[in-house]
Amino acid sequence: PAKVATLKWQSLKDDSARLAAAIGGTVDVMEAVPASAQDQLKGAGWNVESKPGYGNPFLMFNTQKAPFDKPEVRRAILKAIDKQKLINSSLEGQAVEATSFLPEANPAYKKPSTDLSYDKDAASKLLSDAGVSGLEVNLVTTDHPWVLSLVPQIKSDLEALGLKVNHTQMASSDLYANVTDVDNPTYDIVLAPGDPS
C-alpha cells in the first residue's frame, strides 16, 4: 500500500527556481540536484544523495552531413573534449566519465572497443587523416542550465583543435521537433542531456 495519499509533480527546469522551492519548503524531493547547490541544500537540512544514473549528456552528430558522416571526424571531436576537466569544473566532480549510455554498474554494460578518452594529439591526427581542416561547427544545445554549463569548455576544447564553433540553445521540445527529428536535418552537432525532459 502507498505510504502517501497524493503526489504532486512540479516541473521546474530553472536551477534557481528549483533550489528556491526546495529551501522554501514547497517541494519535498528534488531530482538532479545541481552540484553547485548541494552544500546549500545540506545547510538547509536536506539529505542529498548521489547515485550513478543514466542522465549522461551526449553529442549527436548529423551523419547525413559531411564531414560528420566520417567516423574519424566524430571520434576526433569526442577525443578533443577533456571530459574529466568538464566533470571537475562544470560538474564540481559529481560525475564519472561515461564510456557508454549504461553506467558500469549496470549488468548489461560492456566496455567499448573504441577508446574515446581525451587525447588532443590523437584527435588532431584523426582530423588530418580524414582530410578535414578549418571546419566550422554549429553546436546546438538544449537550454538545461547544467548542459549550458558544459558549453564554454567544449567550445574551447574544439577551438583548440582548430575548429570554429558557433553555439545556439533552445528548449528540448523545439530542438527535437524542429532540428533533429525532421526529414532533412541541417544541424551539425547537438549537445543534450540523456533524459531530455
Outline where the language-model segments fall.
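Ligand-site clamp/hinge motif
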Residues: P1-Q40, K164
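Ligand/substrate-recognition segments at binding pockets and active sites
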Residues: S128-P196
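Active-site-proximal beta-strand/loop segments in catalytic clefts of secreted hydrolases
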Residues: L12, V33, K51-P52, Q64, ...
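Ligand-binding "clamshell"
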Residues: D39-S50, D183-T186
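Short, hydrophobic alpha-helical packing/hinge segments within bilobed ligand-binding/sensory domains
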Residues: R18-L19, V27, Q38, V73, ...
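Beta->alpha turn/N-cap motifs
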Residues: D15, E31-A37, Y54, K83, ...
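Alpha-helical secondary-structure segments
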Residues: K3-T6, I23-G24, Y54-A98, L126, ...
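Structural transition elements
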Residues: V96-D129, W146-S149
